[in-house]
């Protein structure tokens, strides 16, 4: 079978517009209890059934009176009120607490702080004691102009009378009609609109609806989204993971997106790569679903049948979208099956098989489609300005979504790009946002200010510590302990090697650099290179741990390797670390000590960027040995041949060390919790953890 090509590739905005033009909003609605309505979309405007409040009530603790009875009261003339009703006394009052209904004859409330009991006179005004009543506290039912005046809450020397409600009280301030009273309908009047059509119901909307006498509300039905994975190679989570078999997780991610955006996901079992079976399963899915997502098979490979199958069932609106990652996406318009639950046109989305591509297409096509079907607007995506410290190339003709981490260094919010592979779903976990590069732009220049679309709250971005330099699994342990005391913190690591990390720190591109550079001349770690590379940058140098480096080999050490010198044996395949990495510096030091030419080692130029990548290369059988930390060998069940011990230090910019999160980090480094956590992992010594090193004065 010949290879296929993208049949109808379009820019993202055109594909989205075509999709929405063919999609029909759901025309039915359903009624749900208010208590179960959170997150649902209103089908029509919602009106109040009752006024709120439905009676005239006290907005303060105090006494209810007729306002006109207080006219003339002043600091020089206290007016006396008696407990009772107009039928029994001349100036009646009753005690009221906040929320109590007023007697029919009352039209004002005097705050309890303004009410006094005892002898009254217009001459000399002896201190009058406030009667015992509930303390007058503003509970939010009154406006800001009605708050008590703290300078005149009590007369000087007056003391509350405990255990007594006085039958006769005095006031020295005149009330206005309906002062400190919540009138009927103050919040909302029966028949007034509460919520508009197409409104997503929030927690305080639930409260307002119930307060206004509503017990049910008409909402749009959740769009039913059939999610159909394709691929003969797919297995379910928990099944044995054999080479060539792929765990099916994309459908779970898409289902979670659908739930978050107000739909009802229906995950279907994977279908093998067979066009007839695929068409049969699609037809069945469309009988009850409002739209369908077909995962994989959307590209131009020999066994990619999604596009041809959808074309045979309807119209391909787009086959290929000018985004990266995500180009193989498909948008199709399908007629409803004969036995369908409704006769509206169905939209089918062909999702790329790579998870990052699929996630981007979900955000750019599936979310607006669900919003359209629900008759509501998409939530605004929060964007933030950031600076690109280095040039970022991009492919012309495609809108590229570059995953980035963000961190504020000084007064600049800096972005750091993550690996761009479409299959690396963990980059989405680590990403703070997307940098979207337009199709007609070939890249971002160093120093450019750009807009980043956030994937997490801005507060978490402000708590991000940018860590560059050497890789070590204990950085994850450090982050975990740090989050105990600083929950909004996050370590965003960039494993570029010790040398490159120090240089990035010097350029102001990171808060902290991890390093383990051995100086061959002095036999000391890190200090000589720090003084040589960033002499003008004020820093603090703190040891994270002393760690053990050695050769990682397969279980049982099948080649009988004993040390570095054995790497030159015939048939031994080696994996090295990148140039500038401290581990590579350590290897070169030992090779020089042994008088070994690096060219004699098969794989000396085969480079990876982390200790875990070294361990994976050995564990998978790709190579026979690599130099790395003991903890990486232990994690993957490899044998370990010790070579050396080294100081693994953290170099903090002084301005960062003096910041709140920097101080928290230093406190964690000097604490017992971190030592205990590191001690639980083989290959580390913590006697010097948290110890600060001093540079020699130049």
Residue ranges and their predicted role:
Residues 536-548, 638-667, 691:
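Periplasmic-binding protein-like
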Residues 544, 553-574:
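Flexible hinge/capping segments at coil-to-helix
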Residues 514-532, 615-644:
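A ligand-binding cleft/hinge motif common to bilobed small-molecule-binding domains
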Residues 2-215, 384-385, 437, 449:
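Phosphate-interaction motifs
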């Amino acid at each position: 079978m010949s290879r296929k090509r993208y049949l109808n590739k379009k820019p993202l905005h055109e594909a989205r517009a075509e999709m929405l033009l063919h999609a029909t909003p759901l025309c039915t609605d359903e009624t749900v209890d208010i208590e179960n309505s959170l997150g649902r979309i209103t089908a029509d405007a919602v009106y109040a059934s009752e006024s709120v409040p439905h009676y005239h009530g006290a907005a303060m603790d105090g006494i209810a009176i007729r306002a006109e009875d207080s006219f003339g009261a002043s600091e020089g003339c206290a007016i006396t009120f008696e407990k009772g009703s107009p039928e029994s006394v001349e100036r009646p009052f009753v005690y009221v607490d906040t929320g109590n209904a007023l007697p029919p004859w009352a039209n004002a409330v005097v705050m309890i702080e303004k009410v006094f009991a005892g002898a009254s006179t217009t001459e000399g005004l002896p201190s009058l004691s406030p009667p015992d009543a509930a303390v007058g506290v503003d509970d939010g039912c009154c406006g800001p102009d009605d708050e008590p005046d703290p300078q005149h809450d009590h007369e000087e020397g007056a003391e509350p009378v405990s255990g007594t409600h006085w039958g006769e009280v005095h006031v020295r301030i005149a009330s206005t009609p309906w002062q400190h009273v919540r009138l009927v309908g103050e919040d909302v009047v029966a028949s007034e609109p509460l919520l508009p059509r197409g409104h997503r119901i929030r927690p305080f909307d639930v409260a307002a609806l119930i307060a206004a006498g509503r017990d049910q509300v008409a909402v749009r039905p959740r769009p039913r989204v059939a999610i159909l994975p394709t691929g003969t190679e797919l297995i379910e989570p928990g099944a044995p993971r054999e080479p060539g078999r792929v765990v099916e997780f994309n459908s779970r991610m898409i289902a979670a997106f659908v739930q978050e955006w107000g739909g009802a996901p229906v995950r279907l079992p994977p279908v093998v790569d067979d066009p007839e079976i695929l068409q049969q399963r699609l037809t069945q899915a469309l009988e009850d679903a409002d739209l369908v997502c077909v995962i994989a098979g959307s590209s131009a490979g020999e066994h990619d049948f999604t596009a041809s199958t959808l074309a045979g069932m309807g119209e391909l609106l787009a086959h290929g979208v000018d985004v990266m990652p995500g180009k193989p996406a498909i948008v199709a318009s399908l007629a409803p099956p004969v036995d369908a639950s409704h006769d509206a046109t169905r939209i089918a989305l062909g999702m790329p098989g790579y998870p990052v591509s699929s996630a981007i297409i979900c955000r750019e096509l599936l979310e607006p489609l669900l919003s359209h079907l629900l008759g509501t607007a998409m939530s605004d995506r929060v964007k933030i300005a950031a600076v690109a410290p280095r040039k970022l190339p991009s492919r012309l003709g495609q809108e590229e979504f570059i995953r980035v981490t963000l961190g504020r260094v000084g007064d600049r919010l800096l972005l750091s790009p993550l690996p761009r592979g479409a299959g690396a779903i963990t980059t989405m976990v680590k990403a703070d946002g997307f940098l979207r590069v337009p199709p007609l732009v070939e890249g971002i220049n160093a120093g450019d200010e750009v807009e980043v679309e956030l994937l997490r709250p801005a507060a978490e971005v402000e708590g991000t510590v940018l860590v560059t330099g050497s890789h070590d699994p204990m950085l994850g342990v450090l982050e975990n302990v740090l989050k105990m005391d600083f929950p909004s913190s996050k370590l965003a690591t960039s494993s570029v090697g010790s040398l490159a990390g120090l240089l990035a720190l010097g350029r102001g591109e990171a808060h902290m650099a991890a390093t383990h550079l051995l100086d061959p001349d002095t036999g000391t770690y890190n200090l000589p290179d720090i003084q040589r590379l960033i002499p003008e940058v004020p820093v603090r140098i703190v040891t994270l741990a002393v760690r053990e480096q050695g050769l990682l080999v397969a279980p049982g050490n099948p080649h009988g390797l004993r040390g570095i010198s054995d790497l030159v044996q015939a048939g031994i395949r080696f994996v090295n670390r990148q140039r500038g990495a401290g581990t590579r510096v350590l290897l070169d030091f030992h090779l020089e000590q042994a008088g070994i030419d690096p060219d004699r080692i098969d794989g000396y130029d085969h480079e990876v960027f982390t200790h875990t990548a070294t361990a994976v290369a050995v564990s998978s059988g790709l190579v026979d040995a690599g130099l790395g930390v003991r903890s990486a060998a232990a994690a993957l069940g490899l044998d370990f041949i010790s070579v050396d011990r080294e100081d693994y230090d953290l170099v903090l910019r002084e301005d960062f060390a003096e910041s709140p999160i920097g101080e928290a980090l230093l406190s964690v480094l000097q604490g017992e919790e971190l030592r205990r956590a590191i001690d639980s992992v083989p290959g580390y010594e913590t006697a010097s953890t948290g110890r600060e090193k001093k540079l020699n004065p130049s």
